[in-house]
């Protein structure tokens, strides 16, 4: 059996894998156990009551977290004309059409989000094999193919997270950093869960959000008691 590291031993002693923690206790534990030499992200895994094998039950979308993610996001925009000027004014890091596509083909992928206006998809479509596997391909379902590229840029910069269930019906996302306050992390988590509830497929029956777990980049996961959260959709 592999020898446990000191960090893993501490986590095993502190975290009860059979317990659901109230959000206050969960965040306090996450902060206590986040001892890496960098500011760790706080990640969430949400088990949904869906059959991921059925396309009409898959959940996909995007939402802007009220307190952002703590990450600096570089945004590339495929567009032209007035939209290009608007994207630049909104804070886009890279704006272009064929010239930007050539950069991508050369492997220059120094961006985290790709946005495109509908008229630019003829150019972006040629980059599917490069952008697709990296989760960067623009898609209207998550608001990254849109005539309003300026708004999309602002959302991306403000802390928008995109979500999509995996083959096990689990959504993985980030809700901030360990140096966020408890209130900021709680508000971000509640905002994400409200967005997921609104995205519930009509064919999904029974309990939709079955389990919510929080973890840090280098830490163990812990289940969160949903009763400690306010996830009533406005």
Curated annotation (Swiss-Prot):
Q: Which Gene Ontology cellular component annotation is one that this UniProt entry carries?
A: cytosolic large ribosomal subunit
Q: Sorted alphabetically, which Pfam families does this protein's record hold? A: Ribosomal_L1
List the molecular function annotations (GO) for this entry.
rRNA binding; structural constituent of ribosome; tRNA binding
Q: Which CDD domains match?
A: Ribosomal_L1
Q: Which NCBIfam families match?
A: rplA_bact
Please report which protein family the annotation says this sequence is part of: Belongs to the universal ribosomal protein uL1 family.
Question: What's this protein's function?
Answer: Binds directly to 23S rRNA. The L1 stalk is quite mobile in the ribosome, and is involved in E site tRNA release. Protein L1 is also a translational repressor protein, it controls the translation of the L11 operon by binding to its mRNA.
Fill in the subunit field for this protein. Part of the 50S ribosomal subunit.
What protein name applies here? Large ribosomal subunit protein uL1
Organism of this sequence = Tolumonas auensis (strain DSM 9187 / NBRC 110442 / TA 4)
Q: Encoded by which gene?
A: rplA
């Amino acid at each position: 059996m592999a020898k446990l590291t000191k960090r893993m031993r501490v986590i095993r002693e502190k975290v009860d894998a059979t317990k659901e923690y109230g959000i206050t206790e969960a965040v306090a534990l996450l902060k206590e156990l986040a001892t890496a030499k960098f500011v760790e992200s706080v990640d969430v895994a949400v088990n949904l009551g869906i059959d991921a094998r059925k396309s009409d039950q898959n959940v996909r979308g995007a939402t802007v977290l009220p307190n952002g993610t703590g990450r600096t996001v570089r945004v590339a925009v495929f567009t032209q004309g007035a939209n290009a000027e608007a994207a630049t004014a909104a804070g886009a890091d890279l704006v272009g059409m064929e010239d930007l596509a050539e950069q991508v083909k050369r492997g220059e992928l120094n961006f985290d989000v790709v946005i495109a206006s509908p008229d630019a998809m003829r150019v972006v479509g040629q980059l599917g094999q490069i952008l697709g596997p990296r989760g960067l391909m623009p898609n209207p379902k998550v608001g990254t193919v849109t005539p309003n590229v300026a708004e999309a840029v602002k959302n991306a910069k403000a802390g928008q997270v995109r979500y999509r269930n995996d083959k096990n019906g689990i959504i993985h996302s980030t809700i901030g950093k360990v140096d966020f306050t408890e209130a900021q992390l709680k508000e971000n988590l509640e905002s994400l869960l409200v967005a997921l509830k609104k995205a519930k497929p009509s064919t999904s029956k029974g309990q939709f959000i079955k389990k919510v777990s929080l973890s840090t980049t280098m830490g163990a996961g812990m289940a969160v008691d949903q009763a400690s959260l306010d996830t009533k959709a406005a």
